[in-house]
């Protein structure tokens, strides 16, 4: 059991028949009454975000999440196929399960598949990915203010803002957390 006083961002817990990841938390000590911990939790099965308040010192059950290193192979209609690098066992996940991750997934990419008691509950991408620009308008030279950007589409179909010097065929490093341009590879 873990005390709510020991909460950390990213901690996974089992509360109310659900698996939750702590997104944010705050220890509150009111002038009158006992202290409590206000937390924001994400349900790892549904993706729903919920705010929950715990009494200070309350105990919660930790959720033992197993991370398996897997390789993304291909999409088969609405199903996406991953292969375990050690056992060569293949796992299929539905497309709606990978809503945000699909923007950055390409064949042969290494990802972490998160499982809880044999059930797949999440896919963790690397912090950054390298994707090739397939479409962008040419940059216009002239007197532009610093930080001028244009729109570019990468090989997965994801569209983002990039600096004017980026051309079609360039390989970009993209942050998977917020989908922003980091640099050219």
Curated annotation (Swiss-Prot):
Its main location: cytoplasm. It is found in: Cytoplasm. GO terms for biological process: peptide biosynthetic process. Keywords: Cytoplasm, Elongation factor, Protein biosynthesis. InterPro entries: Elong-fact-P_C, NA-bd_OB-fold, Rib_uL2_dom2, Transl_elong_fac_P/YeiP, Transl_elong_KOW-like, Transl_elong_P/YeiP_cen, Transl_elong_P/YeiP_CS, Transl_elongation_fac_P. Pathway: Protein biosynthesis; polypeptide chain elongation. One of its GO terms (molecular function) is translation elongation factor activity. It comes from the Bacteria. GO terms for cellular component: cytoplasm. PROSITE patterns: EFP. Involved in peptide bond synthesis. Stimulates efficient translation and peptide-bond synthesis on native or reconstituted 70S ribosomes in vitro. Probably functions indirectly by altering the affinity of the ribosome for aminoacyl-tRNA, thus increasing their reactivity as acceptors for peptidyl transferase. Belongs to the elongation factor P family. NCBIfam families: efp, PRK00529.1. This is Elongation factor P.
